[in-house]
């Protein structure tokens, strides 16, 4: 993978000049000048997904120049490097192969001279056997009762991905009740334990090293709670499984290592739902649906790795994002799913994007002088319309938005879905085209009112429009289409990281806070005043000690 400063490319200089030409052009003008704009700036994927990027401040020339940027930064070479198992995560000397986990073609993928696919398939088969025993009721707890509840204990990628997917795929779930615990705040595990029965609960402890502070603190609390009822430590093996590679620590915890499901260093945490970390997904929706999830992602992987840039959906969305982030100065992107099952989708890609591309050091080890990853946020529609859309419509900040919705709902109650989708379509139209002063005044005339008498109100009802959006319309949210959608965003993030010359797959930014917390923790064990930090941190710790006494 080549290390190329994007701002030093001729394409970047051309884009800067092009921005000067485009910055005052409106989306309304672009549509007025091209009756075929939708056809030119939209694409479908497998007749399952329509991506409409026509309501953006772009022209064919814009996309051509952005594609030149992708060529000059050798995006094609980087894609080939990732899919072929090269160690593109150089700061950790690791390959990046979440694509291998969903490689349904089963073509060999070589890391360090070894095909990883036999091990991937073996873990999948092991998860299949285990999950079928749990779901069927064949697996019994220590009192002979079948499992009714599953508690996934993990944090970050070991929590956000499985939680998001099990929520999105609720229409496919079986009889097992899923719970997710991540926060080291004891309230999280305490509230979940109130809901479950130790005789019928299975705990999944998701930690590659089996040393993650938050996860192991919660796991030991769950174990202590369980043993208060079960008594004998041998019963732990019937109620705990591990998603880990540390067989020694897993065995010491009391888990049978036969129920330890491995994954590999080339699986990044925020890309791990496709691995053994996805066991909670399998237990929720069944193995066949998990395979469909993998298959959808694999289909998008093939699209991403083989489709020319001008028709490649992850690349197109990534380039449009760079256009706003690096030329228009937009600092955030909103992900707005019009489907309640997707209520954790934005939170998932908040981690996916911000932990991946929130870097200020480039691949050469130098501080960048350009913007890297955007701030990602969002909530389901229509809730967001009654919360933060005001700022998107009439605020002073540009917020490019992705609107996502299924054409077919899993819950066809009355006309709910038509009302939901009417809002989905209306919002992107309103953001793009706005409402002029003339229209506001005419609306008053149509109501029999004199606009002159309401001059004090008219300016506040004007919408400038020209707010950019992408619309992603799915035929229906299924395991397959969800897999494709997740992979679409994963590859968008990768593409932006390549072009911006940063390492997308490490996360050193999470380390300093953890190191300092480990230093502070022993200082909280007594009531002595602390003076070893700055005055602010000392003051906070000492007030905490005074109040807890």
Swiss-Prot record:
Cited InterPro entries: G6P_Isomerase, G6P_Isomerase_C, Phosphoglucose_isomerase_CS, SIS_dom_sf, SIS_PGI_1, SIS_PGI_2
Pathway: Carbohydrate biosynthesis; gluconeogenesis; Carbohydrate degradation; glycolysis; D-glyceraldehyde 3-phosphate and glycerone phosphate from D-glucose: step 2/4
Catalytic residue positions: 355 (proton donor), 386, 514
Signal peptide start and end residues: none
EC number: 5.3.1.9
UniProt keyword annotation of Cytoplasm present: yes
One GO term of the biological process aspect: gluconeogenesis
Cellular component annotations (GO), alphabetically ordered: cytosol
Catalysis: reaction(s): alpha-D-glucose 6-phosphate = beta-D-fructose 6-phosphate
MF terms (GO), sorted A to Z: carbohydrate derivative binding; glucose-6-phosphate isomerase activity; monosaccharide binding
Alphabetically ordered keywords of this record: Cytoplasm, Gluconeogenesis, Glycolysis, Isomerase
Pfam families in the record: PGI
Primary site of residence: cytoplasm
Subcellular location: Cytoplasm
Matches recorded under PANTHER family: GLUCOSE-6-PHOSPHATE ISOMERASE
Similarity comment: family membership: Belongs to the GPI family.
Function noted in UniProt: Catalyzes the reversible isomerization of glucose-6-phosphate to fructose-6-phosphate.
Name of the molecule in the record: Glucose-6-phosphate isomerase
Organism field: Salmonella paratyphi A (strain AKU_12601)
Lineage: Bacteria, Pseudomonadati, Pseudomonadota, Gammaproteobacteria, Enterobacterales
